[in-house]
Amino acid sequence: MTETTPEVEVAVEAEVTYSESFVFERPIQTVGRRKEAVVRVRLVPGSGKFDLNGRSLEAYFPNKVHQQLIKAPLVTVDRLESYDIFALLHGGGPSGQAGALRLGIARALIVANPEDRPALKKACFLTRDPRATERKKYGLKKARKAPQYSKR
């Protein structure tokens, strides 16, 4: 009562290739954090425009060092003029927000093109910087600074 069915081998090659013409169904959304700053990043195919809380990159970050820091992941993978970046930044100061934005952009680039991961990881753009302000302790003036000691 056992029937033998012929086994047929079917070779299916489903290779996914990522290229510049990758079409997004919706914008890529990621989050970057640094110190007290939190940044929500939306990556959309475009011409390299930055929109940070409704302002341009140069208006929001007038410091050239911060601008270079933010553009670094895009320059590393040669996609500076491939995407438009829309970001909502809040909390922290300019340095923390710039670091958070860099992390958010790097994470979004990986979602858009996973082949970029080794280059971004080697440049340490995917590492969340854990350093934050140490809390003030009672009995001390600051986190570690003790009040002046008088022997007599």
UniProtKB/Swiss-Prot annotation:
Classification via Pfam families: Ribosomal_S9
Domain of life: Bacteria
Gene name in the database record: rpsI
UniProt protein name: Small ribosomal subunit protein uS9
Keyword Ribonucleoprotein: yes
A GO MF term: structural constituent of ribosome
Keywords for the protein's UniProt record, in alphabetical order: Ribonucleoprotein, Ribosomal protein
Natural source organism: Mycobacterium ulcerans (strain Agy99)
GO biological process annotation, one example: translation
